[in-house]
């Protein structure tokens, strides 16, 4: 059984799932930046043994739904934090959700 924890404040949206209330299986977190209605995607992490099982997609869909409801634009930089995650695979993943490259970062505008 997986437990969901969700935190929403004026400056943060975070969602995580853990198995039986223990160590998180996956985490997604975005935080507000100086510009109105813009947030920065701080983290999308899925533990290795849970990868390729739809967790990253689930988190993205949930985070993006909240952003669309609030009219939030998201900025992110692609940084594979481990050697076993390919940059191109991450880029393709984010593009699937509507992120577009602008300079060195990616932007996703809300769907209204």
Locate predicted features.
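Hydrophobic residues embedded in beta-strands of well-ordered beta-sheets
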Residues: 12-14, 39, 106
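Conserved GNAT acetyl-CoA-binding A-motif
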Residues: 67-83
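A conserved beta-strand-loop-helix scaffold within acyl/acetyltransferase catalytic domains
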Residues: 19-37, 44
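Conserved acetyl-CoA-binding loop-helix of GNAT-fold acetyltransferases
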Residues: 46, 52-65
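Short glycine/proline-centered loop/turn elements that form peptide/ligand docking sites
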Residues: 83-93, 105-112
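Conserved acetyl-CoA binding element of GNAT-fold acetyltransferases
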Residues: 36-48, 75-77
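Conserved active-site tyrosine of GNAT-family acetyltransferases
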Residues: 93-94, 99
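Conserved beta-hairpin
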Residues: 4-27
């Amino acid at each position: 059984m997986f437990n969901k924890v969700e935190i929403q404040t004026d400056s943060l949206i975070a969602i995580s799932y853990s198995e039986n209330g223990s160590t998180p299986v996956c985490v997604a977190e975005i935080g507000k930046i100086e510009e109105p209605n813009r947030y920065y995607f701080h983290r999308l992490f899925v533990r290795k043994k849970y990868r390729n099982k739809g967790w990253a997609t689930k988190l993205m869909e949930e985070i993006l739904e909240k952003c669309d409801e609030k009219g939030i634009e998201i900025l992110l930089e692609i940084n594979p934090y481990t050697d076993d995650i390919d940059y191109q695979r991450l880029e393709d993943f984010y593009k699937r959700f509507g992120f577009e490259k602008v300079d060195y970062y990616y932007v996703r505008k809300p769907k209204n």
